[in-house]
Amino acid sequence: MRVKRGVAAKRRHKKYLKMAKGFRGSGSTLYRTARERVERSLCMAYVGRKLRKRDMRKLWIQRINAAARLNGMSYSRLIHGLSTAGVTLNRKVLADLAVNDAPAFAKVVEIAKAQVS
């Protein structure tokens, strides 16, 4: 019996063209280029999700460092002091405290200062 595969191909083409909506030029209209663009964009999205984690950590460290220096302490001394004091606040929480609750962050810095000196 003869198998006709037009339906499957049409479905696959539609899937890629739907994902390529908004791409420029033939990247959104021609199947072959749309597939290439979509596959590349999915790879870039994967890489971007990894990079975002690095970038956020860098941002948190910059914010903590700036706030720590306002309180007369460097970032590295602050982190060392907190680890020796047994404080288990992560960088995300410390950065949030530094931005949104300066008095609480100052208290944390005092705890670290007591351990370092």
From Swiss-Prot:
Molecular-function annotations in GO: rRNA binding; structural constituent of ribosome
BP GO terms, sorted: ribosomal large subunit assembly; translation
Listed GO CC annotations: ribonucleoprotein complex; ribosome
Keyword RNA-binding belongs to the record: yes
SUPFAM superfamilies linked to this entry: Ribosomal protein L20 (SSF74731)
InterPro entries (UniProt xref): Ribosomal_bL20, RIBOSOMAL_L20_CS, Ribosomal_protein_bL20_C
Record keywords, A-Z: Ribonucleoprotein, Ribosomal protein, RNA-binding, rRNA-binding
Alphabetized Gene3D superfamilies for the sequence: 6.10.160.10, Ribosomal protein L20
Pfam families: Ribosomal_L20
Presence of the UniProt keyword Phosphoprotein in the record: no
Similarity field: Belongs to the bacterial ribosomal protein bL20 family.
Function: Binds directly to 23S ribosomal RNA and is necessary for the in vitro assembly process of the 50S ribosomal subunit. It is not involved in the protein synthesizing functions of that subunit.
HAMAP family attached to this UniProt entry: Ribosomal_bL20 (MF_00382)
PANTHER family linked to this entry: 39S RIBOSOMAL PROTEIN L20
Name the record gives this protein: Large ribosomal subunit protein bL20
